[in-house]
From Swiss-Prot:
Part of the 50S ribosomal subunit. Contacts protein L20. Pfam families: Ribosomal_L21p. This protein binds to 23S rRNA in the presence of protein L20. GO terms for biological process: translation. This is Large ribosomal subunit protein bL21. The keyword Ribosomal protein applies. It comes from Porphyromonas gingivalis (strain ATCC BAA-308 / W83). It comes from the Bacteria. GO terms for cellular component: cytoplasm; ribonucleoprotein complex; ribosome. Keywords: Ribonucleoprotein, Ribosomal protein, RNA-binding, rRNA-binding.
Length: 105
């Protein structure tokens, strides 16, 4: 059984027992329980239920494993030819690691 759930603007395929890295969730601690109720699709062993836009009564219960994980550094380099203009910026995205405990459909 799997569901497609909207977590902070991103659609993810979720199954019970799976670990996910989602965009940073503010004000949560390690071991806290988080629920996501924006379920868009439910596949229960071949029986597919598509919401319009959401499936009523379905939710995903997760446990926070690591509240703050930093992703790899992405470098952004700007240059204008023949002018000596060079600029380098970097960015590290913050994530939260969660474990899917239960899928209620």
């Amino acid at each position: 059984m799997y569901v497609i759930v909207d977590i902070q603007g991103q659609q993810m395929k979720v199954e019970q027992g799976r670990r996910l890295f989602v965009h940073h969730i503010k004000d949560v601690e390690s071991g806290a329980s988080v629920e996501f109720d924006k379920v868009l699709l439910v596949d229960n062993n071949g029986a597919i239920t598509v919401g319009s836009p959401l499936v009523e009564g379905a939710k995903v219960v997760c446990e926070v494993l690591t509240p703050l994980v930093k992703g790899d550094k992405v470098l952004i380099f700007h240059k204008k030819r023949r002018k000596g203009y060079r600029k380098l910026n970097g960015h590290r995205q913050q994530f939260t690691e969660i474990l899917v405990k239960e899928v209620v459909a």
